Amino acid sequence: MKTILSSETMDIPDSVTIKVHAKVIEVEGPRGKLVRDFKHLNLDFQLIKDPETGKKKLKIDSWFGTRKTSASIRTALSHVDNLISGVTRGFRYKMRFVYAHFPINASIGGDGKSIEIRNFLGEKKVRKVEMLDGVTIVRSEKVKDEIVLDGNDIELVSRSCALINQKCHVKKKDIRKFLDGIYVSEKSKIVEEE
């Protein structure tokens, strides 16, 4: 069965400007600018004004959509909400080094754009991970064996964490016993809400 029209709207904060052009959404805020392409989705994007409050809203329509297309409306809204959160508050992921015997040494180079991991499970191999665009990495001052990744795009920050995590993957051993690695310990925003 097809639904004739399913649509949803979301409020846009005053500190953020949004441009919609041919399913490409550009969000600009105090922390910078992010662009996302929704051309693969069969949806209509419009910027509207609320008649009562006069606030800007983003409206997404799906004409004659199947259940999958109707479900993609909510997905697109969530992506745009993440873009708005990114340009207003930013995303921060904290990762901790976990080791039983051999302490993991990590040195951050390239102005916070890459990390080199040494002495993982006592190996001599140096593992180098480049951060994705717009993601910076620093060592935590307060907590020992912790690194902090900051960025505006949640997908790039979380993918950078995944790259670090995958570099420290234990091979040819029982991972229930050998728990060494670098794991995400906390996810938060850079600018906390008052």
Curated annotation (Swiss-Prot):
Biological processes, Gene Ontology terms: translation
In-chain residues carrying the UniProt-annotated modification Phosphothreonine: 75
GO molecular function: mRNA binding; rRNA binding; structural constituent of ribosome
Pfam families: Ribosomal_L6 (PF00347)
PROSITE patterns reported for this sequence: RIBOSOMAL_L6_2 (PS00700)
Bilayer-crossing regions: none
GO cellular component, one term: nucleus
InterPro entries, per the entry: Ribosomal_uL6-like, Ribosomal_uL6-like_a/b-dom_sf, Ribosomal_uL6_a/b-dom, Ribosomal_uL6_CS2
Sorted UniProt keywords: Phosphoprotein, Ribonucleoprotein, Ribosomal protein
Entry-linked PANTHER family: 60S RIBOSOMAL PROTEIN L9 (PTHR11655:SF16), 60S/50S RIBOSOMAL PROTEIN L6/L9 (PTHR11655)
Family the entry assigns: Belongs to the universal ribosomal protein uL6 family.
Stated name of the protein: Large ribosomal subunit protein uL6z/uL6y
